[in-house]
Structures are given as C-alpha cells and as structure tokens.
UniProtKB/Swiss-Prot annotation:
This protein's UniProt keywords: Ribonucleoprotein, Ribosomal protein
GO molecular function annotation: structural constituent of ribosome
PROSITE patterns: RIBOSOMAL_L31
Species of origin: Exiguobacterium sibiricum (strain DSM 17290 / CCUG 55495 / CIP 109462 / JCM 13490 / 255-15)
Gene Ontology CC terms, in alphabetical order: ribonucleoprotein complex; ribosome
Quaternary context: Part of the 50S ribosomal subunit.
Record GO biological process: translation
Protein name according to UniProt: Large ribosomal subunit protein bL31B
Lineage, broadest ranks: Bacteria, Bacillati, Bacillota, Bacilli, Bacillales
Family: Belongs to the bacterial ribosomal protein bL31 family. Type B subfamily.
Pfam family, one: Ribosomal_L31
Domain of life per record: Bacteria
Disulphide bond pairs: none
C-alpha cells in the first residue's frame, strides 16, 4: 500500500439529532466537536439526521421523524397551511 494516500480511521461517536441516540464506531470522518464517551475517553462527535434509532425501516413506525424542511419552515413562518 502507498503511504500517505489513505484517510485516517479513528473511533468517533455518531449522534442522531432527532432522538439524541449515540453510538461509538470507527470512521474516516472527523469533527471539531468532541464528546466524552461512557469509557471516559473523548471522541469526535458527528451529528446525523437519521440513524437506525429514528429511521422508519428499523423502528417499524410509518411516520418519519425528521427535522422540518424548508417548505415546512416557510409555511410555519408565514402562516400557510
């Protein structure tokens, strides 16, 4: 393998923004935000909109709990239904 062309693979914590569910895994993603995990170590924190804890396929719920989109925010702001 060539040296210096592969991304760094480290442990990171992913957090679901809608349910606040967190899990520790390995990834090449990095972040300036960190969190202290249950083992006492500090890891980079990656926020995600959807994870297995909130996706309808994994939860069995038909309603999708996602953050409001642009159209929804516009309609709320200007009172449209």
């Amino acid at each position: 393998m060539k040296q210096g062309i592969h991304p760094n693979y480290n442990k990171v914590v992913f957090m679901d923004s809608t349910t606040e569910y967190k899990f520790l895994t390995g990834s090449t993603r990095s972040s300036n935000e960190t969190i202290t995990w249950e083992d006492g170590n500090e890891y980079p924190l990656i926020r995600v909109d959807v994870s297995s804890d909130s996706h309808p396929f994994y939860t069995g719920r038909q309603k999708f709990n996602a953050a409001d989109g642009r159209v929804d925010r516009f309609n709320k702001k200007y009172g449209r239904k």
